[in-house]
């Protein structure tokens, strides 16, 4: 399984989940816009829908919508969640909203869809399950760990598997955190908060050097 080459933000295409986040609408509504040709899209050989980012920008302009950019603002954390369980995704999003942290989260049920969108999204945090249909979390992380994006990515595996079972499957790449289900939301809150604090410290240090 190969990962798409890294692209500049908003250059090229994205999947339906990312398009929905950019437009502030549901995935179903995005699919409806594609069917009405309001958004330009095509499908990969694997059947995954790709949507032109240029057509999303054009749609926003036609309808006088403010561009909803996940790439704007260094103070916001970009979080990508890969989890095939609907209830877990909803629970994570509800907690993110409740915490009020400056983050933008994009949810995926498919590891393949997430891989296709990562060059456009350029997340700083990845939360991923391991047991998923088609491409599982082990294969997902193996593919991702060979890509340049991985070096600057904070990764947390969220799984119902025990540490022993994970190790028996080959283990995780170095630096990946293991968080077992049921999810300790206090730990996750603290982890994300700490990442944001470190980013602020690093930005101040760069500003002082400049």
What would you call each of these model-derived segments?
Residues 139, 162-179, 190:
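Alpha4 helix (beta4-alpha4-beta5 surface) of REC/receiver domains from two-component response regulators
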Residues 56-80:
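A short, Lys/Arg-enriched interface patch at domain edges and termini
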Residues 86-106:
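Two-component/phosphorelay signaling modules centered on CheY-like receiver
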């Amino acid at each position: 399984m190969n990962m798409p080459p890294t692209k500049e933000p908003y250059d090229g295409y994205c999947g339906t989940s990312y398009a929905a986040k950019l437009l502030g609408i549901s995935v179903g509504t995005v699919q409806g816009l594609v069917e009405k040709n309001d958004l330009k899209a095509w499908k990969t050989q694997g059947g995954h829908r790709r949507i032109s980012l240029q057509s999303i920008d054009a749609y926003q302009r036609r309808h006088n919508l403010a561009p909803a950019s996940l790439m704007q603002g260094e103070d916001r954390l970009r979080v990508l969640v890969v989890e095939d369980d609907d209830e877990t995704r909803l629970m994570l999003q509800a907690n993110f909203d409740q915490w009020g942290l400056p983050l933008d989260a994009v949810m995926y049920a498919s590891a393949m869809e997430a891989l296709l969108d990562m060059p456009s999204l350029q997340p700083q945090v990845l939360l991923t399950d391991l047991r998923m249909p088609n491409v599982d979390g082990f294969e997902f992380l193996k593919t991702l760990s060979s890509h340049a994006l991985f070096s600057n990515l904070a990764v947390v595996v969220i799984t119902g598997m025990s540490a022993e079972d994970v190790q028996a499957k080959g283990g995780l790449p170095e630096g990946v955190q293991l968080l077992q289900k049921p999810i300790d939301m206090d730990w996750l809150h603290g982890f994300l908060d700490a990442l944001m604090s470190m980013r602020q410290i690093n930005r101040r240090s760069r500003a002082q050097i400049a």
